[in-house]
A protein has these predicted regions:
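Amphipathic alpha-helical interaction surfaces in cytosolic regulatory modules
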Residues: 13-20, 36-49
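A generic structural motif
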Residues: 26, 37, 59-61
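C-terminal structural segments of small proteins and small subunits
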Residues: 41-67
């Protein structure tokens, strides 16, 4: 599974990195972000593109798996 580590990055970088990873992915990707609004934006983006997004909150970060 490809991983995008966008922790500590400012918007719109996490979304741009996620979009690029999805474009080049052959399977699920995992995205790590540190802000709640980034998690929300990435989940919405994934769903708008027809993908399933599942998120988990970990200590001071969020993990989103996009399938």
């Amino acid at each position: 599974m490809k991983e995008v580590d966008a922790r500590g990055l400012s918007c719109p970088e996490p979304l741009m990195l996620t979009a690029e990873a999805l474009k080049n992915a052959n399977g699920p990707i995992k995205v790590l972000v540190s802000e709640h609004h980034q998690k929300t934006n990435i989940e919405k983006f994934a769903k708008d593109k027809g993908n399933k997004a599942t998120s988990t909150e970990k200590v001071s970060e969020f993990e989103i798996v996009i399938e």
